Amino acid sequence: MVTIPISASTPYDVVLDNQDRWIDSVDWSRYSMLWVVTDKHVESLYGESFRSTLKLTHPHVVSSVVEAGDASKSLSQLEQLVAEGLRHGCDRETLIVAFGGGMIGDLAGFLASVYMRGVPYIQVPTTILAHDSAVGGKVAVNHPLAKNAIGSFYQPSGVYYNVTRLNTLSVQEVRSGLGELLKHAYLSRYVLESSFEDDLFLDLNENEPLDWVSWLARGIRVKQAIVETDEREQGIRAWLNFGHTFGHALESVEAYRIPHGEAVLHGMVFAFLVSGDEVRAMRLFDWMRSNDVTPIDWQPFDRYVEKMIRDKKNRHGAIRFVLLRETITVESVQLEHLQQTFEQMKGWWER
């Protein structure tokens, strides 16, 4: 078991384990009710057993189940959850339990931030990808025009991983999770004393068991170093958006056919090409191809620009990218250069 304390406006622990020992460490008597929010996929795998375990610690456990997939990160779904909470009798002493992947963490976390002007919540992630979104307190839903356009900063009371639940992830979900983990690996050389960038180019076709407690802890420590310095993204927290400018645009243009972490992988190749680092771009591209990352259904360049101009990092109408040079920079990039990069990357995939 690994415990990583996060210093924030509301401090909390991230616990990584191969079982649910964390349950015995929570003071459940503080809460009038436990409200589990999950999706249909996680519900089918773990919902009943997880709620049964919680019922051993608290007499009042209710649940809400939404459709799996990013389409559930919406205002309409949020409104439905508020209605369910009111029907359940959830009050301001209710604890929301976000039980699922990154979509559930974002949705349930934002629900916690607005339900009755704010109730506590914990994250119980079930995916590799969620090691990023579960830490740091960013919660949001999507708008049809932009991803994560409606949200807030709202820290959880704890983040609790049982990594045995990762055993049921598909190969695509593992690839997607490695997208965010690779992002943290690239950032590690700038924020930690040692880099683990070279360690993560794994052959996913080998089916060898991985020590996920150790791997996730390494990624979370990178995020810890950044968010403890800049909790509300006034400075270096923007570094965590490496790969996300083009990645988010790609997700939106593809109507979320490409999972978030795979979109970030594409976005990091794009960002490396923007900065002129073809060596790292090609190494990542080759790894993506050898591990069958979902290819892009290329659309006209303007479709992606329409999405990138709504990115939250932008200033005064200029599209900005997080770029990894000798230091990490956040730079405005001209449309002409972005189009050249787009055509270069498209050419790599089409050859």
UniProtKB/Swiss-Prot annotation:
Major location (coarse): cytoplasm
Pathway membership: Metabolic intermediate biosynthesis; chorismate biosynthesis; chorismate from D-erythrose 4-phosphate and phosphoenolpyruvate: step 2/7
Xref: SUPFAM superfamilies: Dehydroquinate synthase-like
Gene Ontology CC entries for this record: cytoplasm
Cofactor: Co(2+); Zn(2+); NAD(+)
Localisation per UniProt entry: Cytoplasm
GO biological process, one term: aromatic amino acid family biosynthetic process
Co-factor binding comment: Binds 1 divalent metal cation per subunit. Can use either Co(2+) or Zn(2+).
Highest taxon, organism lineage: Bacteria
EC number: 4.2.3.4
Entry keyword Zinc: yes
EC primary class: lyase
InterPro entries: Dehydroquinate_synthase (IPR050071), DHQ_synth_AroB (IPR016037), DHQ_synth_fam (IPR030963), DHQS/DOIS_N (IPR030960), DHQS_C (IPR056179)
Sequence positions that bind NAD(+): T126, T127, K138, K147
Keyword Electron transport: no
Alphabetic keyword roster: Amino-acid biosynthesis, Aromatic amino acid biosynthesis, Cobalt, Cytoplasm, Lyase, Metal-binding, NAD, Nucleotide-binding, Zinc
Positions that bind Zn(2+): E180, H244, H260
GO molecular function: 3-dehydroquinate synthase activity; metal ion binding; nucleotide binding
CDD domains with a match to the protein in the record: DHQS
Catalyzed reactions: 7-phospho-2-dehydro-3-deoxy-D-arabino-heptonate = 3-dehydroquinate + phosphate
Protein family (similarity comment): Belongs to the sugar phosphate cyclases superfamily. Dehydroquinate synthase family.
HAMAP family: DHQ_synthase
Job of this protein: Catalyzes the conversion of 3-deoxy-D-arabino-heptulosonate 7-phosphate (DAHP) to dehydroquinate (DHQ).
Protein name: 3-dehydroquinate synthase
Organism of this sequence: Exiguobacterium sp. (strain ATCC BAA-1283 / AT1b)
